[in-house]
Amino acid sequence: MFGKGGLGGLMKQAQQMQEKMQKMQEEIAQLEVTGESGAGLVKIAINGAHNCRRIDIDPSLMEDDKEMLEDLIAAAFNDAVRRAEELQKEKMASVTAGMPLPPGMKFPF
């Protein structure tokens, strides 16, 4: 049923992939991405774990209304999260490459 190497080989391969995924997740948590809004007037840097590292607001926005600034901050944060998730997908794809997965199954679980 499992061919040469059998179930033991499959389990070893799964364990190696799990170790690689854990290492990759640790690396991803250390990466930093920056999201922007308002043509770069608001920038938010987050790490791969989506923790905010920095917020940069152009001084010209301090004179504008509060609601607009809040919207720009939210948009920049959402952009940063989207970029972090894209980066995570790219990094994790290298770990799962070569291992056949059943249809619909994705890593990380």
From Swiss-Prot:
The keyword Cell division is assigned to this record: no
Keywords: Cytoplasm, DNA-binding
InterPro entries: YbaB-like_sf, YbaB/EbfC
Subunit structure: Homodimer.
Keyword tRNA processing: no
Name this polypeptide is given: Nucleoid-associated protein CGSHiEE_00780
Pfam families membership: YbaB_DNA_bd
